[in-house]
């Protein structure tokens, strides 16, 4: 299955993220996928990448979709904490002193910015022009601000917000293409155990909390979850 994803300003984005996951969940709910044989193993093409997809069916419950992402690539490290903080409407004290921001990609390259705590993440009020400049200079598409201070510390590893002025997204409630790189970075640093599934929290600041499941096993990164239909309509072409 070939999928293409566009932001509200018409920018096409790649990577296996929540947009693709939502498409698979809708196709399953609408009966557009093969109904026989239980769980499904499929493949999707996004922006030239062909990657596995697994649809898990449980009786009486919404399906769960797991998608492989590309192997992680670790890009530019941004050590100018003052510039990053200012672009996010924060001060240097809101960011961690011992870990720099870095661009990481598992299909889409995003700048991962570590904050001291959840309050710092919630305080962010990005300046779109300044943040877009920081992202262009770093070679990143969007910005994933995170802390290791989740709402549910027993079940989650990070609390996050995602901003992407480069493609017209002020803030996103769930971003699988950023959660995958974040867990890849944490796993590479020993911050999460290998071959386990962890939860990344996002969307709380928007009143649309999301819990993104991510599995990291060496070079294999998978994101998954379920979802609900929140709107329906008709598009005339």
Where are these regions (language model features)?
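Active-site proximal loop and beta-alpha junction motif in alpha/beta enzyme cores
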Residues: 1-16, 20-237
